[in-house]
A protein has these predicted regions:
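Loop/turn-rich, solvent-exposed surfaces of beta-rich toroidal or solenoidal domains
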Residues: 403-424, 443-453, 458-477
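Blade-level signature of beta-propeller repeat domains, shared across WD40, Kelch, NHL, RCC1
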Residues: 474-478, 499-534
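Short loop/turn segments immediately following beta-strands, especially the blade-tip
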Residues: 373-376, 423-428, 477-486
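One-carbon transfer enzymes
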Residues: 1-343, 347-356, 366-374, 380-384, ...
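Conserved blade-ending motifs and adjacent loop-strand segments that build the rim/top face
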Residues: 434-450, 485-505
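Beta-propeller fold detector
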Residues: 284-286, 332-337, 379-385, 431-437, ...
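Structural signature of eukaryotic scaffold interfaces centered on beta-propeller domains
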Residues: 296-303, 347-351, 393-400, 450-453, ...
């Protein structure tokens, strides 16, 4: 791998106006420590042909949904320095393909750039003639194995796809046939095209950095573009799409007003992931009774003595607190020292003969880890150095190769982004992994419990949040974990017949607990959601 501290890569930015989209601006800004914009390649005559009669309703949909906060225009000049140069040219156009003239190509060749990033123009003919060490990188929003072409997100929503993909590839003369440098999967907001696209554009911006790092590491992804090449939708297709969105919005409104998730915890059979299979059905042995006065219990973690520490709520509330449960009694843990807001996901770990709990507490502030006494009372609170400015979701620790590895999501994109930090001391200082986010996939990004060690293999559990929240767990075998890289491979999907879930799994070796939920009708379900806002 190249030493990123030596010299920044010199890049050329291909544009066709004085501004670029907000998400494009953020993508480049996120790489400011490893790249420098040497040259702006400015096409002055780029045009797209439009068939207004055939696609008039699509262009109306564009105004209402596709244009959003992430497509707001930002001047690219804010990314340049005083030494940046601008090369203006007029492209040659044949159909949807555009070509950069030979004179401009020769000017750019003299600059010996490391790579080009394309944010403007249509399809670029002969990108290989723009001589750069790592070629021309370009975004495509859509999974090339399923949905090629355009518009981004439309057909995924229309066909109720599991997720929407995005890729950064090195361009060639054939559609989606260049080397794939970075790829991610993102959650679909089934009832809103605008929200789907805003999240897609905002979250996919991180792919540019990963693509550049993979260029430096000479890494490519084995992705074959076998998906259907879609075109702009007809007016009839837009009408059908709009009706689907209306129906889904009505269903979502009904759920918000009159339905809630009734979470429960159950003891389950022992799990073994040694044999790979598409789905593993969990057998529930005994469901724990919900304590009196409690609305639901979820997020179970098994304590050394076999008791369960979990999240609980009062009735008609969504604000979680921590509770221990055993067959004899239940006890609410005093957590006022951590704040008055939501607490959940109480990950537990033993360290230096001390029992520690690290709950999800993003609503209260930066992450801490707490010492528990034999009565499971908090006796001491430790801040995690290096994470003071982060708001972590469902954090989990793993000790491996003389290091503590902290896996967590961040508030805002917790459904499909997993981040990693490491430290030689459990209390920090923690350093962010160079390939963050290390997982971009709504089927497994968000943690679903502690790591499993089976036959000296490490397995990570990730929530499946593609459609319903916490509806199943994807088990992943960790295949690579070091300061330079992280990789994992899905092994199986855990499910519970007749219920939604599991959402969290925990074991102490002898006992295994899971949580699950059913959707229940309640005429005052809306009340808990209103109270959660205050």
């Amino acid at each position: 791998m190249s030493d990123l501290t030596k010299k920044k890569l010199q890049i050329g930015l291909i544009v066709d106006s004085d501004s670029i989209d907000r998400w494009q601006f953020d993508a480049v800004a996120n790489c400011s420590d490893i790249v420098e914009i040497n040259t702006i390649i400015y096409c002055q005559n780029s045009q797209s042909k439009k068939n207004l009669l055939k696609h008039v309703l699509y262009y109306l949909l564009n105004l209402l949904s596709i244009r959003n906060r992430q497509t707001t225009q930002v001047a690219w000049s804010k990314l340049t320095s005083t030494s940046s140069q601008i090369v203006k040219f007029n492209c040659q156009q044949t159909g949807n393909w555009q070509t950069i003239d030979v004179t401009t190509q020769e000017k750019l060749a003299e600059k010996n750039l490391d790579l080009f990033v394309k944010f403007g123009m249509n399809l670029l003919r002969d990108p290989n003639l723009l001589r750069a060490k790592y070629g021309v990188l370009s975004f495509h929003h859509g999974d090339p194995m399923k949905f090629r072409g355009r518009p981004a997100g439309f057909y995924e929503l229309k066909q109720h796809a599991d997720e929407i993909g995005a890729v950064v590839q090195e361009l060639s003369n054939h559609l989606d046939a260049g080397q794939m440098r970075a790829f991610g999967k993102y959650q679909i907001c089934a009832h809103s095209y605008r929200r789907t696209l805003e999240a897609l554009y905002a979250n996919s911006a991180s792919l540019l950095r990963q693509a550049i790092l993979n260029c430096l590491d000479e890494q490519t992804l084995n992705i074959v573009p076998t998906g259907k090449n879609y075109r702009l939708p007809t007016n009839f297709s837009v009408v059908h799409f709009s009706l689907l969105m209306i129906i889904r919005k009505v269903k979502r409104l009904f759920f918000g007003l009159f339905q809630h998730r009734q979470w429960q915890i159950a003891q389950a059979e022992h799990l073994n992931f040694a044999i790979e299979k598409a789905k593993t059905e969990i057998l529930l042995l005994k469901t724990l009774p919900i304590p009196r006065g409690v609305g639901f219990i979820a997020d179970p973690f098994v304590l050394p003595n076999g008791e369960v520490i979990c999240e609980a709520t009062t009735k008609n509330s969504q604000r979680g607190f921590l509770m221990t449960i055993d067959n004899a009694e239940n006890s609410r843990i005093k957590t006022s020292i951590l704040g008055k807001n939501h607490l959940s996901f109480p990950f537990v770990v033993k360290h230096a003969d001390r029992l520690l709990v690290m709950p999800e507490m993003a609503a209260n502030g930066s992450q801490v880890i707490c010492e528990l006494n034999q009565s499971f009372e908090i006796t001491k609170v430790h801040s995690l150095q290096g994470l003071e400015n982060e708001r972590l979701i469902d954090p989990v620790l793993l000790f491996r190769d003389l290091k503590w590895w902290l896996f967590a999501d961040k508030s805002g994109n917790e459904a499909d982004h997993l981040f990693l930090w490491s430290s030689e001391n459990i209390y920090g200082p923690y350093v962010a992994h160079r390939m963050n986010p290390i997982v971009v996939d709504p089927s497994r990004a968000r943690n679903a419990g502690a790591f499993f060690n089976i036959n000296n293999e490490i397995f990570r559990l990730g929530q499946d949040n593609r459609h319903d929240y916490g509806d199943g767990i994807t088990v992943c075998r960790v295949t690579q974990l070091n300061d330079l890289a992280y990789d994992e491979a899905p092994v199986t999907r855990l499910m519970i017949a007749g219920h939604k879930g599991p959402h969290t799994v925990s074991t102490n070796g002898s006992k295994t607990y899971v949580d699950y939920y059913d959707k229940k009708f309640s005429p005052i379900a809306w009340l808990a959601r209103v109270k959660a806002q205050f």
